[in-house]
């Protein structure tokens, strides 16, 4: 009986040590888990920014509809200050000879507000569908699409921005 009791106590002591070791390991991994969670949230924020951009582009552009642009097809930078170069054209996006349009160059200096981020999104030359085709997927008829050169858009969400209220936003695109 003495051997059984010692064996049981030994097993119990090993079990308690194992529990303590597991708890210490859990404490040690908690920091990296929080960092991972933070990175995950940032990735979700980028997706949210992309969705907002797509919505704003479709709402404020006059003749075209942005469709089927995947996350990999644009780059985004966040800048807090500096001058923004805005390019205007006399041609409408619907014009067939878009590449030969003459551009007017303007410089726009936007006053920065603390806590306001401006998102710059560069779209490579890609196909846009006309808005009347917005319910159709993939712009099915080639003659109803247009190929644009690289386009740079920026938008600014103000601190009082609420998800469903897109009134406090500044949005602009230009083509290079």
Curated annotation (Swiss-Prot):
Superkingdom of origin: Eukaryota
Provenance organism: Rattus norvegicus (Rat)
Gene Ontology molecular function: any one: cysteine-type endopeptidase inhibitor activity
Encoding gene per record: Crp2
Entries under InterPro entries matching the protein: Cystatin_dom (IPR000010), Cystatin_sf (IPR046350)
Family: Belongs to the cystatin family.
Gene Ontology CC: cytoplasm; extracellular space; vesicle
Keywords of the record: Disulfide bond, Glycoprotein, Protease inhibitor, Signal, Thiol protease inhibitor
Residues annotated as glycosylated: 71
Protein name, UniProt field: Cystatin-related protein 2
Tissue specificity: Prostate.
